[in-house]
Swiss-Prot record:
Binds directly to 16S ribosomal RNA. Keywords: Ribonucleoprotein, Ribosomal protein, RNA-binding, rRNA-binding. Transmembrane segments: none annotated. PANTHER family: 30S RIBOSOMAL PROTEIN S20, SMALL RIBOSOMAL SUBUNIT PROTEIN BS20C. It comes from the Bacteria. Belongs to the bacterial ribosomal protein bS20 family. This is Small ribosomal subunit protein bS20. It comes from Rhizobium meliloti (strain 1021).
């Protein structure tokens, strides 16, 4: 248990940031799931549209520190590769 005032404040602050980060991570998963569902259905146009919506969300998460920038880039790259393979 935190004893000092600053430690108590830090605990409150961490709880708030954790809630924000959890919400953002959940939102990212939803966007990625939509892309993966579109890929599974084989609809190239729908998958491309879903990817276009998911990409800024992933990069925003990297900017906000929810995930590492390399992780976000890797996820975007792999999704784009799978969407592109639908047209071939």
């Amino acid at each position: 248990m935190a004893n000092t005032t600053s430690a108590k404040k830090a605990t409150r602050k961490i709880a708030r940031r954790s809630a924000v980060n959890k919400a953002r991570r959940s939102r990212i998963r939803s966007f990625v799931r939509k892309v993966e569902e579109a890929i599974a259905s084989g609809d190239q146009a729908l998958a491309a549209a879903a990817l276009k919506a998911a990409q800024p969300e992933l990069m925003r998460a990297a900017t906000k520190g929810v995930m590492h920038s390399n992780t976000a880039s890797r996820k975007v790259s792999r999704l784009a590769q799978r969407v592109k393979s639908l047209s071939a």
